[in-house]
From Swiss-Prot:
This is Hainantoxin-XV-3. Belongs to the neurotoxin 03 (Tx2) family. 02 subfamily. HNTX-XV sub-subfamily. Residues 21-56 form a propeptide. Residues 1-20 form the signal peptide. It is found in: Secreted. Disulfide bonds join C58-C72, C65-C78, C69-C115, C71-C91. The keyword Cell membrane does not apply.
Amino acid sequence: MKLCAVIIASLLVCVAVASSSDNQKEFAQEKEMTREETQSLGEHEKDDEVTGSEERSCIEEWKTCENDCECCGMSTLCAASWVDGHEIKLCRNEGGKLKKVLHFIQKSVSKIRSCKK
């Protein structure tokens, strides 16, 4: 009985290893670039060299923007606000999930404290 379990387990390991190597080969083939793609990549690098002298900057928080890409920081978004009947887009730091969780905990604790009084 134990021998049968060992044989089945070893066969399952062999199948798992074989299937993972096939998946790695498929992934490697998908990642290979064609000649046209590498030529266009080379042209793009030449364009970057030409425009490399231009300074690239980002918009700081609470200044006007058009796209999320223009704002500084990973968690900064270009969010729309309505002021005096017209829309203004400003860069705002959303802070990510951790900040939202901590804010939720802080609100919960303050509500519990206010209920105790």
